From Swiss-Prot:
Region (Flexible loop): 103-113
Database matches in Pfam families: S-AdoMet_synt_C (PF02773), S-AdoMet_synt_M (PF02772), S-AdoMet_synt_N (PF00438)
Positions bound to ATP: 19, 178-180, 258, 264-265, 281, 285
Cofactor note: Binds 2 divalent ions per subunit. Binds 1 potassium ion per subunit.
Organism: Corynebacterium efficiens (strain DSM 44549 / YS-314 / AJ 12310 / JCM 11189 / NBRC 100395)
Protein known as: S-adenosylmethionine synthase
Assembly with partners or alone: Homotetramer; dimer of dimers.
Family the entry assigns: Belongs to the AdoMet synthase family.
Residues annotated as binding K(+): 47
Binding site for L-methionine: 60, 103, 258, 289
Region described as Disordered: spans on this chain: 108-131
Record pathway: Amino-acid biosynthesis; S-adenosyl-L-methionine biosynthesis; S-adenosyl-L-methionine from L-methionine: step 1/1
Amino acid sequence: MSQPTAVRLFTSESVTEGHPDKICDAISDTILDALLTADPLSRVAVETVVTTGIVHVVGEVRTSGYVEIPQLVRRKLIEIGFTSSDVGFDGRTCGVSVSIGEQSQEIADGVDTSQEARGDGHFEEDDRAGAGDQGLMFGYATNETPEFMPLPIAVAHRLARRLTQVRKEGIVPHLRPDGKTQVTFAYDADDNPSHLDTVVISTQHDPEVDSAWLEVQLREHVIDWVIRDAGLEHLATGEITVLINPSGSFILGGPMGDAGLTGRKIIVDTYGGMARHGGGAFSGKDPSKVDRSAAYAMRWVAKNIVAAGLADRAEVQVAYAIGRAKPVGLYVETFDTAREGLTDEQIQAAVSQVFDLRPAAIIRELDLLRPIYAQTAAYGHFGRTDLDLPWEATNRTGRLREALGLK
């Protein structure tokens, strides 16, 4: 069957938990979770670097708790599947170096006592905590999937999660932890997905694997499985270009193949390039860092806008100044998809009325002082159908509609 005519093609990618950058994200967030368990008020900024045979953990921390970082690092590496130098890393024998200092007192002072609280003494309790840095954060939602995520990144993540699942459960033998997925969807003139055009999977494997056998296995147990599981058969009726390990063999992977670094997969972590990004990474940061907490809040806002039926797509931006509680900017864009009779400015005013975007309020409303972050380190922070994440709640739809005078 021929494919429908495409107006444009859009591509997103994901990576597995064995990708070197994702190893680093997982280690950083595992350390963060352990510190929040020991002391929920911990201030954490932990970066990880992995390369052949060694893990470097660096950063700044303020906490009353104690965690055994090398033990956490090794446990996470083994959990991912790096148990032998043959597969690119051995979590049991690799070197682990730790160089963590104390959080800057000047930064701590600005977060503990905001500019508003340092004023004339007239301030609300949620004005007390200042933003941990300046910056801009975006959130996005669209009604093209049930989870209100862009379809390309949603499917790329499903493929990456399934690739890891078939490896760990032995459904497809001879796979190793490192891997990447990429999907290209065609969109029609109305900006709706019309068909799945291309799927790319690159996966690390044992030396004895035959490439033709591997393609058959991954088509059946990963690609076809995800298409059925996601209910995408109607978008996969034509010929799909499938590329499995298009560079050839992929035996050497993990940190032995490429060095990894925390925070280097920020588009994978968010919306797959379908929305703008403020540039700040998430992993290894406690929620006083608005790079993380405000980006989560913006996803919460955008998802509630779309779930409330106010627009088909929504992108929201917030901006902060370090040491100041109140945002310095808020912007709503619906790409001409707002409900008839509504403007972006009206929706923005409703958002300001319904959502308190001061850091202390975000942390309280989303209950962020909990060890919930390691589970987000791979396969995306948003639209996770396998996790119960507070920023995915659609619990403000009624209040948004009420603020706009809608029933």
